[in-house]
């Protein structure tokens, strides 16, 4: 049996209008769609009559192994992420699983990364033009990165005067990281530094608030 293919698909911000044509094509030709339950819902209209595998938020590696297993069985698989799959998405973990399994580019399962608009781009478009010059992204999730490392990155970015996009600012169990990030930033930035708080960009529950670093 011939090997299949894995598409690592970035869906963009979430609305079908902002999904790339290549992302649609990848999903259309796929036998199997794998993703976090919330992301599966975003493409519900595009995946009828396909095998759909839904996984929870902390089951990233399970998704990767499922994709590899089916591709080795000859299936075409779309492993989906919101935004861009290479920016806090599934591309990195998938390549780790592939390499650990002995996979090499051009040998066996074919892999294609399908880029999408990441949150830094989508959110910026909704609030004006904050990324005209140098910018950086920092995730506040310490699930895979130690918090002291994240703190050092925040401080370095603040000292360097980057425009900063903070991903994963808080969750139900993780509420203090954003407070600590604010404390660090205030050591190097003015209290009146503008802040845009964007949630669910381009989705039905989109919410945008403007504040300052001191009051965010």
Can you annotate each of these PLM segments?
Residues 22-26, 49-50, 94-97, 128, ...:
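Short, solvent-exposed amphipathic alpha-helical segments in soluble enzyme
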Residues 67-73, 125-129, 150-154, 208-215:
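Short, surface-exposed amphipathic charged segments that create phosphate/polyanion-binding patches used
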Residues 1-3, 25-26, 70, 103-106, ...:
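Solvent-exposed alpha-helices and their adjacent loops that cap or buttress functional pockets
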Residues 6-8, 159-216:
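A contiguous loop/helix-start segment that scaffolds small-molecule binding in enzyme catalytic cores
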Residues 41, 86-88, 120, 202-205:
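Short, active-site-adjacent cap segments at secondary-structure transitions
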Residues 9-10, 79-82, 114, 138-141, ...:
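Short beta-strand segments
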Residues 1-111:
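Class I S-adenosyl-L-methionine
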Residues 15, 21, 87-160:
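Class I SAM-dependent methyltransferase SAM-binding "motif I" and its flanking Rossmann-like core
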């Amino acid at each position: 049996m011939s090997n299949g293919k894995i598409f690592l698909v970035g869906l963009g911000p979430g609305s079908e209008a902002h999904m790339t044509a290549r992302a649609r094509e990848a999903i259309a030709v796929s036998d199997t769609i794998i993703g976090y339950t919330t992301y599966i819902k975003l493409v519900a209209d595009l995946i009828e009559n396909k095998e759909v595998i839904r996984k929870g938020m902390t089951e990233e590696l399970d998704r990767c192994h499922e994709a590899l297993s089916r591709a080795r069985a000859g299936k075409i698989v779309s492993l989906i992420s919101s935004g861009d799959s290479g920016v806090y998405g599934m591309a990195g973990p998938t390549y780790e699983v592939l390499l650990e399994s002995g996979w090499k580019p051009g040998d066996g399962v074919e892999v294609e990364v399908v880029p999408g608009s990441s949150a830094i781009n989508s959110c910026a478009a909704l609030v004006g033009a904050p990324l005209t010059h140098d910018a950086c992204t920092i995730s506040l999730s310490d699930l895979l990165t130690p918090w002291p490392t994240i703190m050092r990155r925040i401080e370095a970015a603040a000292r360097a005067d980057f425009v900063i996009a903070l991903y994963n600012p808080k969750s139900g169990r993780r509420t203090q990281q954003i407070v600590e990030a604010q404390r660090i930033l205030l050591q190097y930035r003015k209290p009146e530094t503008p802040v845009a708080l964007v949630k669910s960009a381009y989705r039905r529950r989109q919410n945008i608030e403007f504040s300052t670093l001191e009051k965010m």
